């Protein structure tokens, strides 16, 4: 289906799935470092998680390099009572600074995703571009960057094109979905994806844009339409 729709990669696969994508003629655009039910909630904003997260990335980054997977995802984590936002940011900087040298050595980029806490991920700490940029700008590694999810940030803050133009140097990967609903990129939702894709292209971005919508009708038709809209 992906190849028929004009898609060249599949996003968010685990290491034991990367070969399946390759055999189908597809790249894995972003890989997972682990299978955990608490993957989103348990992130770098809590120092108690660092040993676990660093171990997962230390195992996965060399495998990703050998497999040709350019990005591996990580999460900021959920809020906790008694921990301020700044303490969470500081913890992220400390933990990610420890893994950045290995990411640079392997040439694999760790991408951290901001999510909306309003609709889909209540309690998630990094629910703004400001939070994400505060972290990666302090880590200051070309291999620790952000996954800018257009849907999630439209829910939380809007102003998508201006944000891309202002902060694109920190963005290594993008996700799409329609808003409201997180469904197809069609006329029932508010985001103007051709204009957004032109703004991304104008920054010189040469990575992947991944479609992460929940289909409400024929999935292949929705994917074809998304590819058509975003091909600028």
Please place each PLM-identified region on the residue numbering.
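Active-site acidic/histidine proton-transfer and metal-coordination neighborhood
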Residues: 43-145, 155
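Active-site-adjacent beta->alpha loops and helix N-cap segments on the catalytic face
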Residues: 15-26, 82, 191
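Histidine-acidic metal/acid-base catalytic patches
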Residues: 1-4, 68-70, 126-148, 152-232
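Active-site-proximal loop/turn and secondary-structure-junction residues that shape catalytic pockets
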Residues: 14-16, 34-36, 77-80, 114-118, ...
């Amino acid at each position: 289906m992906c190849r028929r729709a004009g898609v060249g990669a599949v996003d968010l696969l685990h290491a034991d799935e990367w070969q399946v994508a390759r055999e189908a003629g597809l790249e894995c655009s972003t890989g997972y470092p682990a299978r955990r039910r608490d993957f989103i909630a348990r992130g770098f904003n809590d120092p108690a998680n660092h040993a676990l997260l660093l171990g997962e990335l230390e195992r996965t980054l060399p495998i990703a390099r050998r497999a040709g997977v350019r990005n591996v995802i990580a999460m900021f984590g959920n809020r906790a009572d008694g921990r301020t936002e700044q303490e969470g940011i500081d913890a992220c900087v400390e933990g990610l600074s420890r893994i950045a040298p290995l990411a640079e050595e392997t040439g694999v980029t760790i991408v951290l995703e901001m999510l909306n806490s309003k609709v889909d991920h209540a309690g998630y700490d990094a629910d703004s571009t400001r939070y994400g940029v505060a972290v990666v700008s302090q880590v200051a590694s070309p291999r620790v960057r952000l996954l800018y999810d257009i849907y999630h940030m439209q829910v939380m803050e809007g102003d998508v094109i201006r944000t891309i133009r202002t902060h694109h140097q920190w963005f290594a990967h993008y996700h799409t979905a329609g808003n409201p609903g997180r469904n197809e990129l069609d006329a029932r939702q508010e985001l103007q994806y051709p204009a957004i894709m032109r703004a991304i292209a104008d920054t010189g971005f040469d990575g992947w844009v991944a479609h992460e919508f929940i289909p409400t009708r024929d999935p292949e038709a929705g994917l074809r339409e998304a590819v058509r809209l975003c091909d600028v």
